[in-house]
Amino acid sequence: MASQTPNLECRMYEAKYPEVDMAVMIQVKNIADMGAYVSLLEYNNIEGMILFSELSRRRIRSVSSLIKVGRIEPVMVLRVDKEKGYIDLSKRRVSEEDIQTCEERYNKSKLVHSIMRHVAETLSIDLEDLYVNIGWPLYRRHGHAFEAFKILVTDPDSVLGPLTREIKEVGPDGQEVTKVVPAVTEEVKDALVKNIRRRMTPQPMKIRADIELKCFQFDGVVHIKEAMKNAEAAGNEDCPVKIKLVAPPLYVLTTQTLDKEQGIEILNKAIAACTETIETHKGKLVVKEGARAVSERDEKMLTEHMAKLRLDNEEMSGDEDSGDEEEDTGMGEVDLDAGAGIIE
C-alpha cells in the first residue's frame, strides 16, 4: 500500500456519485450565464450545476443575494448522469430537515476524512487504499465511520479486528492464490488510534452561572460563607461545583463536565441550596445569568476582569487604610486563590 508520493485525494464515501433526492454539501466555484458551477465536497470535489431556476421558489430579483462564490451549503441532487459525469442540483428543493441532516452528516464525515488523510500523509499511503481497507468497511458496519471511531477511542481491537483484505500470492507450485489477511497493519493501527484519540476524546466543558449574593445582617460574612459551602456541596465527583467572588456582590459558580445537561442541572441545584441558606438569614440571592456552557473566550474575559478588579482593590487599599473606617456591608472578602474561602 505504501508509495513515495501518496495520492491524498479521495471521496468520503464508497459510492462515486450521490443518489438522486439526496442532500449534499457543496461549495460554489463559479457563476455562469445559466447557473452556478459547484464542487461536491463529500465526493472529491466533482462538479455539479445549479440552474438559476433551481435557486429559489420565489421570483429571483438578484442572483448575488441567493448564491455567492465560495459559499458552502447543502443542496438537493436532481439528476446524475454517471456516464457523462453530469450532476444537476437544486437549492430551492432542499428542506430545513434536509439541511440539518446533511450538515450533521458532513461534519462527521469531514472529521473522519481529516483523520484518515493525516494518517495517509504521515505513513505515505494512498488515501483511497486506506478508505478501501478501513474507512468504507466501517461505514458499512456502523452506518457511519464516525460512530466506529467513537468506539475505537476506548476499544480499537473490537472495531479494527474484524476487518480483513484479500491479497494474491504465488504459491510453491507457481499458482496464484488468494489469502485473507488483517486489513490493518500494526503501523496503521497505531497511527489511526493515536489520531482518533487526539481528535475525538471528549473534552469536559465548563458550565457557569453568575449570581449576586448579599447579606447585611449581623455576621453577614459568616452566613455568606455558609451559603457558598452549601452551594459547593451540591456538586458531585463528576460535576464538582466551585464558587468564586468577582466583585461584591457578584459571584460565579462553575463546574466542568462531559454532560452539558447534567452540569446545568447541578449548578441549578447549587444555586437553590445557596438561595435557601442565605434567605434563612434574611440575605438575598439574585441570578444575573443562569447556568450555561461557556467558551474559552468567556473564561478568559472573566479572568481578565477579576485580575483588573484585584489590581484596582490593591491600588485603593492605601487610601482605605489612611481614611475613615467605612461601614461594613456584611459581604466579606473572598480569597480568590483559595477558591471559596473567605477572609474575615
UniProtKB/Swiss-Prot annotation:
Segments of this protein annotated with the region Disordered = 312-344
Write out the GO MF terms: mRNA binding; translation initiation factor activity
What disulfide bonds does the UniProt entry report for this chain? none
Origin superkingdom: Eukaryota
The residue ranges flagged as biased composition, category Acidic residues, are: 314-336
Q: Which Gene3D superfamilies match?
A: EIF_2_alpha (3.30.70.1130), Nucleic acid-binding proteins (2.40.50.140), Translation initiation factor 2, subunit 1, domain 2 (1.10.150.190)
Where in this chain does the record put each S1 motif domain?
21-92
List the GO cellular component terms.
Golgi apparatus; nucleus
What CDD domains does this protein map onto? Answer: S1_IF2_alpha (cd04452)
Name the chain's protein.
Answer: Eukaryotic translation initiation factor 2 subunit alpha homolog
In which organism is this protein found? Arabidopsis thaliana
